[in-house]
Amino acid sequence: SVGNIFTFSRSAADHISERVSNFEIDVESQDSIQKAADKIKDHIIDRVIIASGILHTENFGPEKSIKDLNYETFAKVYSINTIGPALIGRYFIPLMNKDEKSIIAFLSARVGSISDNSLGGWYSYRSSKTALNQIVKNFSIELKRTNKNAIALALQPGTVESKFSEPFKKNVSKDKLFTPDYSVELLSQVIEGSSANESGSLLSYDGEIIKP
């Protein structure tokens, strides 16, 4: 059964259920992340899911060639896709259940796989997810020493109907373009079905382990 649910976002929102509490967090601020964790430090956490991510804004899009490489773009993408999630791990992993199976899962991407990269491009996004996958692997190794019941996962959600994927969905077949609810359902099954042997891996929405 589900107990309390804590959600964190850029702006706190009201929820229908009394079991759901929402707090503000800025994934680009270490102080904000630490304060967010402090707000639930008296609770034992069974599941932590990090869904922050950036691919494009009004000011930039994924790079198509080396001529598009830009310091500000790299800094912004790494800040949200890599550094923020790493710091969330730092402050939330110590709150995870040590007596029963607990899981921390990060939304990543197949394009972060070096062996799977045959198209090139998307320099900052690809490499930010590659770095995130390495961080998740590191978390899994450390958790073997500090919390043997904890699992760290990176997740490939597929292409989900959202503002995030809007500019690119024309290249995706209809059966591979998921609604947010369906994507959540698939990823929930992967998370709940995961084992200690898969800790540190990048798992696809269908349960496939994606090679680094």
Sequence positions of predicted segments:
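Short beta-loop-alpha junction of Rossmann-like oxidoreductase domains
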Residues: 14, 115-116, 147, 156-169
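Rossmann-fold cofactor-recognition segment
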Residues: 15-32
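A short, exposed helix-loop element centered on a Lys and neighboring polar residues
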Residues: 89-90, 137
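Conserved internal alpha-helix within the Rossmann fold of NAD(P)-dependent oxidoreductases
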Residues: 84-89, 187
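Hydrophobic structural elements of the Rossmann-like NAD(P)H-binding subdomain
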Residues: 49, 105, 152-155, 165
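C-terminal helical subdomain
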Residues: 154, 162, 166-212
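Catalytic loop of short-chain dehydrogenase/reductase
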Residues: 54-58, 62-83, 98-146, 158
